[in-house]
């Protein structure tokens, strides 16, 4: 029996978007869901209790980084990632593939795996489909990812075709290496860039392997938003309706809503935490850069429509002062706000699906946020 089970609760009559639940060994979370990223077994500056309070039903950790520091065997010795970081709800781990291809400029892709350099100290390393699964088995995450090749954007059709074929072979090898299928659900990752025929081939290959869930990778890597939406419209109908669909690396408010409309259940991105560290905030009326001089004497909250801890207690002027002085508390406040904003947005999206009005909600949100303006500022 699979460790992961998807339960469809409702389909939005306006858009076809899905409202559901995903059941895991460490509990159930609602979908659509945004997953905060805890790269090194922590969501930067946030405690597990704060994440739970703001509605994070699942978080993500990074296989590549945890393999290098502190090492998967130490985490296994601690009783697994949940005990190590004191998080008793679901955890998803990526395969490390994206980091191998994005952080290491020196890499050699072979059929057996990838030879590359440690981005911290230059040491030679090797990661294979089997090794990526072994590390994740040691970490003990609820949802694991297959090891995939992450081609650059743009890439030629010829290169992408070879990459998709290799990713399919690697997915099959990873599935065979998986030692804990009753405890951990392994997802296959659909690749293929912007080429619809290759996306179809990738989806067909992976669906034939009967994974408990499917990820859509290789998007949000520099392609225009309309290309991403076109690829999603083509790809999600090719995936089983009774299993979860996860769009990797997407976290801007507009892309979350548009992804849900196109049948996606799960999202993750470092965006809300990364931009928070330089003082960029998501608000109901658009992007706000707290360092700007115009906020020096502004004693309003970051977002007057937000009820998060930050907005209930602190002013723009105070947070601007903290960020300009590089005080950690300022980063905590902006991080808390941005994560709360996205998690609350997904809560609103779920309510809109329940009420069969997601298309109306999108129109209202885009209008208020300013996405419909020609000078719209996105992330």
Curated annotation (Swiss-Prot):
Subunit relationships: Homodimer. Within each dimer, one monomer is responsible for RNA recognition and catalysis, while the other monomer binds to the replacement base PreQ1.
Name recorded for this polypeptide: Queuine tRNA-ribosyltransferase
Record keywords, A-Z: Glycosyltransferase, Metal-binding, Queuosine biosynthesis, Transferase, tRNA processing, Zinc
Naturally occurring in which organism (per UniProt): Listeria innocua serovar 6a (strain ATCC BAA-680 / CLIP 11262)
Protein task: Catalyzes the base-exchange of a guanine (G) residue with the queuine precursor 7-aminomethyl-7-deazaguanine (PreQ1) at position 34 (anticodon wobble position) in tRNAs with GU(N) anticodons (tRNA-Asp, -Asn, -His and -Tyr). Catalysis occurs through a double-displacement mechanism. The nucleophile active site attacks the C1' of nucleotide 34 to detach the guanine base from the RNA, forming a covalent enzyme-RNA intermediate. The proton acceptor active site deprotonates the incoming PreQ1, allowing a nucleophilic attack on the C1' of the ribose to form the product.
A molecular function GO annotation: tRNA-guanosine(34) queuine transglycosylase activity
Binding site for substrate: 94-98, 148, 191, 218
Pathway info: tRNA modification; tRNA-queuosine biosynthesis
Lineage: Bacteria, Bacillati, Bacillota, Bacilli, Bacillales
Co-factor remark: Binds 1 zinc ion per subunit.
Record bears the keyword rRNA-binding: no
Binding site for Zn(2+): 306, 308, 311, 337
């Amino acid at each position: 029996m699979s460790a992961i089970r998807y339960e469809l609760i409702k389909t939005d009559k306006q858009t076809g978007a899905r409202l559901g639940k995903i059941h895991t060994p460490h509990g159930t979370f609602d979908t659509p869901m945004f997953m905060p990223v805890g790269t090194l077994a922590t969501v930067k500056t946030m405690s597990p209790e704060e994440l739970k309070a703001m509605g994070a039903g699942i978080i993500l950790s990074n296989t590549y980084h945890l393999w290098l520091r502190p090492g998967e065997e130490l985490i296994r010795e601690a009783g697994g990632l949940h005990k190590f970081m004191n998080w008793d709800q679901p955890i998803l781990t990526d395969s490390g593939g994206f980091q191998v291809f994005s952080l290491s400029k020196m890499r050699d892709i072979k059929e057996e795996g990838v030879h590359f350099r440690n981005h911290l100290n230059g040491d030679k390393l090797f990661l294979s489909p089997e090794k990526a699964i072994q590390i994740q088995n040691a970490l003990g995450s609820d949802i694991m990812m297959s090891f995939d090749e992450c081609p650059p954007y743009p890439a030629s059709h010829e290169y992408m075709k070879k990459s998709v074929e290799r990713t399919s072979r690697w997915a099959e090898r990873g599935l065979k290496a998986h030692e804990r299928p009753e405890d951990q659900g392994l997802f296959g990752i659909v690749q293929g860039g912007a080429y619809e025929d290759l996306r179809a081939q990738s989806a067909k290959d992976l669906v034939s392997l009967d994974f408990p869930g499917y990820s859509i990778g290789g998007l949000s890597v520099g392609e225009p938003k309309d290309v991403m939406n076109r690829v999603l419209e083509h790809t999600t109908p090719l995936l089983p309706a009774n299993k979860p669909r996860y769009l990797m690396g997407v976290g801007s408010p507009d892309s979350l809503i548009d992804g849900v409309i196109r049948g996606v259940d799960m999202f993750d991105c470092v965006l809300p935490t990364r931009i928070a560290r330089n003082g960029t905030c998501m608000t109901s009326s658009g992007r706000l850069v707290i360092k700007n001089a115009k906020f020096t004497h502004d004693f309003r909250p970051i977002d007057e429509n937000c009820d998060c801890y930050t907005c209930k207690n602190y002013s723009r002027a105070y947070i601007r002062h903290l960020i300009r002085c590089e005080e950690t508390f300022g980063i905590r406040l902006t991080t808390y706000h941005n994560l709360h904003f996205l998690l609350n947005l997904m809560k609103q999206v779920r309510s809109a699906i329940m009420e069969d009005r997601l298309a109306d909600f999108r129109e209202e949100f885009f209008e208020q946020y300013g996405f419909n303006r020609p000078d719209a500022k996105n992330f």
